[in-house]
Structure formats: C-alpha cells, structure tokens
Amino acid sequence: MHGRIVECVIPNKESRSYRCPLGVVAVISLWNFSFHLTQRSIAPTLALGNAVVVEPTSDTPVTGGVLIAKVFEEAGLPPDELNVIVGAGSQIGDEFVSHPIPSLISFTGSSIARILLAKRAAVNTSKTLFSSSVVPTHLVLTDADLKLAVHAAVVGKCLQQGQLCMVVNRINIEESIYDEFPPSSLIV
C-alpha cells in the first residue's frame, strides 16, 4: 500500500492518491467456474490487507467458498481474515449486502442482479465493485505462433462448453497476418 502525489494541471495545487485497505470486503460468489472466479476476488483483496466475507451461491458452496477458505487456512491465513457464509441468496442476500460492516461489496454477474445489489448496498453507502459478463477477445499479433494461436482460440471458445463468461467471443487478428490465419478456426 502506498500513496503518491500526482501532477496537477491547476497551478499551486497538488493531487494526492492514497492506496489503503478498506477493512472488510463482501464477495458474492458465482455458480459457474466458482473456484476460479471466487479466488480471483479473494486473493488480491486479502493481499491488500483486507478481511473477506464470502457468500457463495447455494449451488456451489464448497468450490465457491468453503474449499477456498480451507486452502487459505492451511496456507497460514490468520483466523477471521476469511469467512464464508453459506445459505440461499433469497434468505441471506439482502442482509449480506445491506450489512453496515463491509466497506466494499464485490459481485460478478448479471445486470439485473447488479442493480438490485447496488440499491441495497446504497443503504450503508458501501462501495461496490461489479464485474459484468465480458466479451473476451483473442488477440493475434504478427509475432504469434499461428498454430498455437489457433489452438488457443479453439480452447478459449470451447472451454467449459461455452458456459463461462470468459469464453472467447471475438478473435482479432493483426491485418498483416489475417490471410495466414486458418479460416476454419474463425468459424469456431
């Protein structure tokens, strides 16, 4: 964690930027690819000095929270730095996001759910960090190994039978090598 002074365009003024832990961060876990997506929120949050409370979806409480907590515990994470609350979102979700303790609520999911969560989090003016479905792009540049790039594009598109929000939906090929890229891989 650090701070810095950033150059300001206004004479005789300075802009300061401070990075510091927020305290407790609430993470709402997903059902699909839950281990990876949940730890992607937890690991950096803990590394920056925050405590985490995770509410895994009731469909995947083990891979979306309990197993991750066990891994961190075995790695030596101090007690109470990572907590898991298991239950149906319909029963505990409102209380989880409107609770006054979390300084930040992290959620990856649909637009409708984000809107509902933002309204509930606003009760305590909690900060929110929402990640929606993205459109991952497979980028192929002139120095790429084309055989490997084609393989990576196919794997990226077909991984998890396309049920993952990170599945490749677009392939961008640098114009100078476009004609060298096998057309069949573009159909995937």
Task: Map each language-model feature to its residues.
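General beta-strand structural signal in soluble alpha/beta enzymes
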Residues: 54, 84-86, 107-109, 128-132
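PLP-dependent aminotransferase-like
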Residues: 38-93
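A structured beta-alpha segment of the ubiquitous adenosine-cofactor-binding alpha/beta core
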Residues: 14-15, 83-106
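N-terminal Rossmann NAD(P)-binding subdomain characteristic of aldehyde/semialdehyde dehydrogenases
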Residues: 1-42, 75-77, 82
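ALDH superfamily catalytic-core signature
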Residues: 112-188
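Beta-loop-alpha module in the N-terminal Rossmann-like domain of NAD(P)-dependent dehydrogenases
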Residues: 25, 32, 88-95, 109-116
